[in-house]
Amino acid sequence: MRSFLLASLASLSVISVYGHPHARSTLTRRGVDLDSYRMKHAATYKNVAEVVADHNINTLAKRASAQDIATDLVKATIPNATFRLVSDSYVSDNGVAHFYFKQTANGLDIDTADFNVNIGRDGNVFSFGNSFYKGDVPAPPSLTKRDGSEPVAALKSAVDVLALPVSAQSATAEPKDATETYAIKKTTGTVSEPEARLVYLVDDEGKLALTWRVETDIMSNWLLSYVDVKDGSKVHAVVDYSADATYNVYPWGINDPTEGERQLVTDGFYPPASEFGWHNDGKMAFKTTRGNNGIAHTNWDNKMSGFLDLPRPTSEDLNFDYPFSLNQTDFHDYGNASITQLFYTSNKYHDLLYTLGFNEKAGNFEINNNGAGGVGQDFVYLNAQDGERFNNANFATPPDGSPARMRMYIWNQTTPFRDCSFEAGVVIHEYTHGLSNRLTGGPANSGCLSMLESGGMGEGWSDFFATAIRLKPSDTRAKDYTMGEWISGSEFGIRNYKYSTNLEVNPQVYTDVDQYTRVHPIGNIWASMLYEVLWNLIDKYGKNDDWLPEFNSAGVPKDGKYLAMKLALDGMALQPCNPTFVSARDAIIDADKALTGGANLCEIWSGFAKRGLGEKAVYSTGGRTNSFDVPAGVCNNSTVSSQARRVKLPLSV
């Protein structure tokens, strides 16, 4: 296990960590109040105005590198301190370079003593903060490698004092390469091996205490417990990398405000998909709407760059609870609520798509791929209330390795105006553009839905996934859905036809594509076909109304809804660059063959054939040809006649 280096500067909204936190504390249920073990010593911060006014800082000699300037500032500020440069220094998009230093004493880290220096574009000190210790340093302890009994005893003390669900009766300690650091073996109840490291800590009296920093990941909490070396029964402090994030949002499954009320929901991430949680990228833990999968903010001024500096809410306890009323007339007043909703919905969808196969290797959107393949460095910039225009939303998908951008606009077709971040279907629609563009033609090629027909199918996949996700437990194939009804203020929504299996409600067939020269009406036809396939599969396998699918031992979703979504997703990865309806249909059929051995060919073919994309359908630039036929032998050794397209199909097809 890699060691952790805390950087608990009160002036910063991030904490440097390595590894992944998990959510939801259980220690309170065991009678342990972790808040009583919080660190007591805050850092100081010198802002840019104070730096400019400080003559001593301005007289620091110009050096060859920003790192040298930062180092000189630390030396000048705390002349007698010993320290080391932490390896996570970087330059922000705004041109400010950030350097982090850890104070040491007698060759050991002082875990609560940090110094951060920010160097501006001009090479001068911009601002800085520090919590360096200024008192007397005790005599050095013996730093010879121990026999392992002390770190094991420290772990047992932490387990006893904090009532941790860990068994360490047979534990042994093995030295690691880092100074006075031990891996503790033969324990149970932890996600990974505990680690003990000898460090100093500033105690409640303001003096240096020599402690064992014991790291234990027990899933519900990821703890650093500082156990006194002399008095093993004393735990000076505890740091918990985990945090229960709370969001006041329309929960997953509520498509828009007409379907339910906002609620306070806690966390909600799926650890295999978001192994660092939603507010951590494996190196930094964020106290704002930022994490490995995305960063959400308002963009009222339509800025085209500098997204990291845009306004977003900050909460030390990750409690994102902001007021919102449907009667509010000024959308600026509920910007934080909009950001929170957008961040929540996008992260939920990221995790769902991961379970269906849109992972790191497939080109999903994450900053840190954590060794799982793909390029990384490409979360999604989530622009709430984007000021470019009204009545729209869009998603820009560059190749794998470059961040995507979602722009959600205010809609002015109602009074008061409406914010599309509060309609989950719109958020999911936009995010699905990232899915279809990354999968079609491979993650490195984002230009594979650039034809009119393939671009239209991109719109269709987005509508389809949004509609499938909003299905309710009581829904049957008789249920019709409108896309964008709430945001537009129109019962007809923003598409030509509702999504329906009733040909009287939605009569569209393949050749109707001929009349359109824009992608959205073409997408309406493609999604209508997928909606037919969806209900054929639901009628066969039932519908899972939970947030995530259940899979059988072969990796096949057990229900029809998630199976339809899985096949659509797998088909994207199989289909060629710039597919047609015909080739995309074939790819979905191939996806079923690959996943299930072709167990659902009748349901899939029947869904497409009902709307003219049967066996003999033809794509041509001069005009498309309908076919309402299912291949012979696919459905009970018979064909579905073209006459069947105007009547309800039997449940068996």
From Swiss-Prot:
One of its GO terms (biological process) is proteolysis. InterPro entries: FTP_domain (IPR011096), Fungal_virulence_M36 (IPR050371), Peptidase_M36 (IPR001842), Peptidase_M4/M1_CTD_sf (IPR027268). GO terms for cellular component: extracellular region. Induction: Expression is controlled by the prtT transcription factor. Keywords: Glycoprotein, Hydrolase, Metal-binding, Metalloprotease, Protease, Secreted, Signal, Zinc, Zymogen. It comes from the Eukaryota. Its main location: secreted. It is found in: Secreted. Residues 20-244 form a propeptide. Its EC number is 3.4.24.-. The keyword Flavoprotein does not apply. Zn(2+) binds at residues 429, 433. Belongs to the peptidase M36 family. Secreted metalloproteinase that allows assimilation of proteinaceous substrates. This is Extracellular metalloproteinase. The gene is MEP.
